[in-house]
């Protein structure tokens, strides 16, 4: 099939996370199907180093992610752990951070 794409999650190149315009220190990503031009929809892999914080942001659509490893703490103190599938609905706002 010529319209098939296979991504091996253990063999990808991560680039600085620049979805907010400029790179966020400690964050990197690998775009799989993400396209900012279509409203920022699609899939990507995101890595956050220890002691890293995302910028506070508003979601125009759904944001969904699977915690593959580690822990992520949201602005309200909720801790997302390995195996958690998290959904933020449209118009939700938040930021998240990692500890050591």
For every predicted segment, state its role.
Residues 1-40:
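A short, N-terminal "cap"/entry segment at the start of jelly-roll beta-barrel domains
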Residues 27, 43, 62:
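Short coil/loop residues immediately preceding or within conserved phosphate-binding loops
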Residues 37, 90-100:
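Ligand-binding loop in jelly-roll beta-barrel domains
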Residues 44-46, 54-59, 76-78, 96-98:
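Short histidine-centered beta-strand/loop micro-motifs
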Residues 59-75, 82:
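Glycine- and acidic-residue-biased ligand/ion/polar-headgroup-sensing regions
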């Amino acid at each position: 099939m010529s319209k098939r794409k296979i991504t091996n999650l253990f063999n990808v190149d991560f680039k600085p996370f620049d979805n907010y315009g400029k790179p966020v220190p400690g964050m990197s990503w690998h775009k799989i199907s993400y396209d900012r031009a279509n409203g920022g929809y699609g899939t990507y892999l995101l890595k956050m180093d220890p002691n890293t914080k995302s910028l506070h942001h508003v979601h125009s659509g759904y944001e969904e992610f699977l915690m593959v490893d580690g822990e992520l703490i949201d602005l309200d103190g909720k801790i997302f752990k390995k195996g958690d599938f998290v959904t933020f609905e449209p118009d939700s706002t938040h930021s998240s951070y990692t500890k050591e």
